[in-house]
Amino acid sequence: MTQSEPPSLPLYSPARVRDLLTRHGLRPTKSLGQNFLIDGNILRAIAQAGGAAPGVPVLEVGPGLGVLTRELAARGAHVTALEKDERLRPVLAETLAGQDVQVVWGDALEFDYASLPAGTRVIANLPYYITGPLLARFMQAPGIISATVLVQKEVAGRLAARPGEDNYGFLSALAALYGTVQHVRDVPKGAFLPAPDVTSSVVRLDFDRARPAPEPAFLKFVEAALHHRRKTLRNNLRLAGFGGEAVGEALMAAGLRPDVRAEDVPLEDLRVLARRLGVLR
């Protein structure tokens, strides 16, 4: 600490965050989506909503300075923190000293999420630039039962969107296929240092592991169907390599208009189409 910053200040206070960055010669890296939380109420709300509790295995992606990490560990969770930025090694060695936290250094997009123990909960302030790919990996990892994450408000809206709504797309469909989405709260720009360009939201996704996992072939079909969500479903499927006549017959059999837009089609109807087109048996 500098002489001007009393040690009684919480780690998430702007003064402590600036002090850490200054002493370690660091500047937040925009390319890594580094915006550090400086609001204790929001930190506690994320940990609470995520279910951090004694003995619960928790994965945090992008611990940054260790602010949320400490809150999770303080609640007794067994925390694994996955960090890519090697510059933060001395920072986390300082801020997580004495904490029950395992820090894994590496790229979150290359981590083996299937290796996580059953009952794992993801609780994280996700790097915004890889939010979609990370959420898809969480959904498909059998050991992860929930993900409570801080994301761009626009992404939160897409996750909860239903067919027919303006922001419905493949990410919305994925979330519905694997479980449910709950909006926890919005987070203003001023809760971060540095402040991001957009408003954020905390959402919780619960994954129903008792439900059979979607077939890989069906996931690819849904992705192709929603690739250009405002175009007609017929055009999207033709672009994906399905014959126009076969698509027309499948749409008719499913009771769908030939000009129906992809974003308006429920997953149940897409499954019917997938069967009609030989994607599923």
Curated annotation (Swiss-Prot):
- Asked whether the keyword Secreted is assigned, the reply is no
Q: Which GO terms describe its molecular function?
A: 16S rRNA (adenine(1518)-N(6)/adenine(1519)-N(6))-dimethyltransferase activity; RNA binding
The record ties this protein, via Gene3D superfamilies, to:
Ribosomal RNA adenine dimethylase-like, domain 2, Vaccinia Virus protein VP39
Please name the top-level EC class of this enzyme: transferase
Binding of S-adenosyl-L-methionine, residues: N35, L37, G62, E83, D107, N125
Which catalysed reactions does the entry list for this protein?
A: adenosine(1518)/adenosine(1519) in 16S rRNA + 4 S-adenosyl-L-methionine = N(6)-dimethyladenosine(1518)/N(6)-dimethyladenosine(1519) in 16S rRNA + 4 S-adenosyl-L-homocysteine + 4 H(+)
Top-level taxon of origin: Bacteria
- Cellular location of this protein? Cytoplasm
**Tagged with keyword Coiled coil:** no
UniProt function note: Specifically dimethylates two adjacent adenosines (A1518 and A1519) in the loop of a conserved hairpin near the 3'-end of 16S rRNA in the 30S particle. May play a critical role in biogenesis of 30S subunits.
**Protein family (similarity comment):** Belongs to the class I-like SAM-binding methyltransferase superfamily. rRNA adenine N(6)-methyltransferase family. RsmA subfamily.
* Official protein name in the record: Ribosomal RNA small subunit methyltransferase A
Source organism per UniProt: Deinococcus geothermalis (strain DSM 11300 / CIP 105573 / AG-3a)
**Taxonomy of the source species:** Bacteria, Thermotogati, Deinococcota, Deinococci, Deinococcales
